[in-house]
């Protein structure tokens, strides 16, 4: 998945109108909550066929960290 596609998917998951980037800090997003985490895990597992665990997602600080989990 390209970075641009990933950012678009994350914007959909977070339902944000403001632009996000790979440098966006997750703790600064009110929309980053347990529902968003579950949605991210489902998207990651479906898109990459790789098992992504909630524990790893909770340790992420930025959008880039979430993207790196897909590799």
Model region roles, listed by residue range:
Residues 1-42, 47-71:
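Phosphopantetheine-dependent thiolation modules in NRPS/PKS and related acyl-activating systems
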């Amino acid at each position: 998945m390209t970075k641009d596609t990933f950012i678009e998917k994350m914007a959909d998951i977070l339902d944000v109108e403001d632009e996000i980037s790979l440098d966006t800090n997750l703790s600064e997003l009110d929309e980053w909550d347990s529902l968003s985490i579950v949605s991210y895990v489902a998207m990651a597992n479906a898109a990459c066929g790789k098992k992504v665990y909630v524990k790893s997602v909770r340790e992420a600080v930025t959008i880039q960290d979430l993207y790196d989990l897909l590799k």
